[in-house]
A protein has these predicted regions:
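Short acidic, low-complexity intrinsically disordered linear motifs used
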Residues: 1-13
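Polar/charged side chains located within well-ordered beta-strands of beta-rich proteins
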Residues: 11, 22, 94-98, 151-154
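Zn2+-dependent metallopeptidase catalytic core
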Residues: 14-46
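Active-site scaffold of zinc-dependent metalloenzymes
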Residues: 46-84, 93-100
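Acidic, low-complexity, intrinsically disordered interaction modules
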Residues: 79, 84-87, 104-105, 134, ...
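Post-HEXXH active-site segment of zinc metalloproteases
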Residues: 83, 99-129, 133
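Long, well-structured alpha-helical subdomains associated
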Residues: 116-128, 135-191
Length: 191
């Protein structure tokens, strides 16, 4: 319940940024012939996920975040290939699942608040690997086999960024004094 006010504030502020999967694919530039397959897959597997697309107001290169059990936000400002933005949407949507399944807040946020770097690094690797596995498998199912074959290692680079993320979160927690993880994310992206 403590996160409810954060969710309501986010929803109130950003309903204008809510996009359908069809709108997302169009705005990020996915080729028309691929869209029906992706839309069908998304509607079967991710229909509960609400997608927000807008330019983040952040000096940090944050590409996307999840903001609850079924809310993701993607940074429209960062230049990246269309299939990478779709990968990012899938990756963040898996973080929604992880949050619903439990353990995410304790491993990802509470460890930073408590200064437990080692526990954070282990949880971070596990959560990111799982989200990447899901996104890569989903991209293959949506017709991006070739792209995943060529780019999987690069797309998995975030799995090795735990130290950087820990430091950024630590600094931001001290600077903005968030009430919870979602408040931190909201403040990081300028919502």
């Amino acid at each position: 319940m403590k996160h409810l006010s954060t969710f309501k504030l986010f929803e109130r502020l950003d309903n204008s940024t809510l996009v359908t999967i069809e709108q997302l694919l169009e705005r990020i530039g996915i080729p028309n012939p691929m869209r029906p397959t992706i839309v069908s897959w998304w509607n079967q597997n991710r229909s509960e996920i609400r997608i927000h697309l807008f330019p983040f107001n952040s000096p940090q290169p944050i590409a996307g975040v999840f903001l609850g059990e079924n809310i993701i936000a993607l940074n429209e400002r960062l230049p990246m290939p269309p299939h990478v933005k779709l990968f990012l949407a899938l990756h963040e949507s898996r973080h929604c699942d992880q949050h619903r399944e439990g353990g995410f807040m304790e491993g990802y946020y509470d460890t930073v608040v408590n200064g437990d770097r080692e526990s954070f690094l282990q949880a971070y690797r596990d959560f990111e690997r799982d989200a990447n596995d899901f996104a890569i498998q989903s991209m293959r199912a949506c017709g991006f086999e070739r792209e995943m074959n060529f780019e999987e290692m690069r797309l998995r680079g975030n799995e090795r960024a735990g130290d950087m993320v820990y430091q950024m979160m630590s600094n931001d927690i001290q600077r903005v004094n968030p009430v919870d993880f979602f408040d931190l994310l909201k403040k990081q992206i300028g919502v």
